[in-house]
Amino acid sequence: MDFFNIHTHIAKHPESEIFSTDVHLFSSVSKSKFLSVGIHPWYLTDHDVENQLEILRKAIENKQVVAIGECGLDKLKGPSMEFQTSVFKKEIALAEKHGLPMVIHCVKAYNELIQIKKSTHPQQPWIIHGFRGKEALAKECIQHGFYLSFGAYFQEDALRAVPIEKLFVETDESELSIEDIYLRIAHARGMELKELTESIKKNVERVFFKP
């Protein structure tokens, strides 16, 4: 049974996970088969942003890279929202140019994120990773075309509100196994584990490995 993990910082199963790394660590990553690389809002620096963007431009030419991220907006940590937004829009442009989905970090900035999506009209999928919001927020995100990825901690009502074709599963930094998280999610949604794994596999193939 395949338990695909779309976002992890702890490499364990290279054939069935996407290892997420920030641009400043990209050169040290070698073991993982599939990578996502981006400029995390926590690590944005005004004096070094052009270098960060140049590393990202070069990194996404690597065939291991199947997504841009994590990237996004964070009101609790990082530089000003204006600066975060300007860099995020440049990452959006790169994702569109290279046909790559985006794995998004969003903290207390969902209104801003939705407005950016509405104004930029992206053609590539946007996945909000580690979603912990409530049911109403989950429904709003789905309405605006986002995919939602759930990890070790989640609101069950929000999880159940997500259509299966918009759902992903991840470990992020958790020490829990991806199998355990799949089991929790299957139980919360009242579905068979095999049905969940097969559905997520289809989503992964459609979003990250499209022909």
Task: Please report, for each region that a protein language model flagged, where it lies by residue.
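Mid-domain alpha/beta scaffold segments of enzyme catalytic cores
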Residues: 1-211
